[in-house]
């Protein structure tokens, strides 16, 4: 697939630092930001004046944060202040309506966002209309794929941080995702009306924990219940929110008691920008005071270059400080023409091609989300090049299938607005397109392909069976639909246990799908106990020498393979805590002179990877194993691809057991938050679950503990946490790495697997 400047930065973001050497680094594709800027300017030279005007007033943004930081409440204010909705509805409002962006019944009942929701809104700034495509994303780690696919197609984001809790576990996850897709952000410190709100501590945490240069461009007027508005440090004016819902902005002079603080924070802003912007650095060296225009320009340049994030503050729930964030989105976040997007030209040996956001260019778009709507499958598309028009035909670059678009819509949560066309840089949805998330579409004039989003592996599984055998048809429909919608939701049938197994990112993730099956398909299911996704690997090398011989009259089977099996992982580095177990399996052939024909080697390769799907210890997937074949024998009559396939499979199992095999269990990063009086109870609970505590953050109201714990210890943890914190604690889990389980647990798992196999043999 694609090597995109925007999309494939799994190894790290194109991060920049204040230092000259770091400014030259670009971990994605080996280019500097200046080189990227040169490409942007070159592409802008190939678009029309109409394209430039249209794109300059367009923003594709996401709202991301830790769970319960106020993302959806903030999104509701955006809808209200832009005139998209006529009244404000809260996430847990008393009017029974619920937030507009949480359109699923389950979301409104649980008070959390499960699916990302998109909307289109218009904001007027300085008498200019700016058009926003806004995507509100979930905060819970179990629904991380919703954040991944949103950030994949967005040009900028608003990172919402709680003024009381500061940077939390999922904040750090979202930060990594933004870096993966090179998405610049502005930061909004929310909940400034809460007791214990400390925006300066939150900014310090952004700098320290996220390793991102951040500085305030606002100072709050008042605090907690007396929060009245904000002072704009750049423009040096005060903004007050008046009206019943804070809809009226009153501009005034800076309050006398805040002038000293504003001057201090303005100096700090200039110092921070001097580290990342040459123009401000020159002013700083010459001891000149930058003008407002110079500061605004520097903030925009540094934000788009992802070397800096401007920090705004307020309270979405109290209707304070939201409108200035909308202005900041217009002023500091990039429009679609400021971002380099690259595809591969399949007909030209996958040569990278920069996409031009011009209306007259050949159409190129990416399907980033599928949803089952009232009128069939709804496919969300981001248009990167050209125009998408109602009635035109588009071609799936992967399958070659052609589809005529009968309907184009802009989304407003679960409502739709029909449109005749959408241009480059826009997001829309359509019906009747058979595809998967991440598929590229063109109009047939070009053969381009774009990369998909990063999809993490599931960490938890459970068996599921419909109670009523008459529901099997609907059960199958639900499974097929959910898999198409969510790449992190996996389904497979276990031939040994004769059970359907579903896998996902956590207990809540699977619980939601079981509940959706009941509500949307009227299928009530029984579920087994959640099972950990164990893995198997080896820790030492051993020689491989296996002969498969079978004679049964006529042509028999003969294959001999000689070589070695060894761990891919550097075990010394693992033992020293400098590395984790490798995830890939590697097959190598060093056969010379045609001693084993190439077609038999290919059969060995396929058999090796197939066999690695089920290890000999517990039937779990094998990872981090290398098989080398450097010798062997064949028989002129009896050797075949099947014989070498069997020899590889049996040789794999036999040698695997000689390589000091171990079972690996998923280790999770766990973060607990509760009122400070429960600190002792949280520590005791972590110790009880054999967690290794790595960090404590004790605030005025809350205490946060972070550490690592095996997933096996975390089942039922929510119940124990509620009990020891009187229902006031919360926790989050995120997969960290695989590590060997204890010898005692390994023996238990191996014995249980052997008993299961014996029971199946006896049953036959």
From Swiss-Prot:
It holds the Pfam family GTP_EFTU. Gene3D superfamilies: 3.30.230.10, 3.30.70.240, Elongation Factor G (Translational Gtpase), domain 3, P-loop containing nucleotide triphosphate hydrolases, Translation factors. Residues 56-337 form the tr-type G domain. Residues 1-23 form a transit peptide. Pathway: Protein biosynthesis; polypeptide chain elongation. PANTHER family: ELONGATION FACTOR G, MITOCHONDRIAL. This is Elongation factor G, mitochondrial. It comes from Yarrowia lipolytica (strain CLIB 122 / E 150).
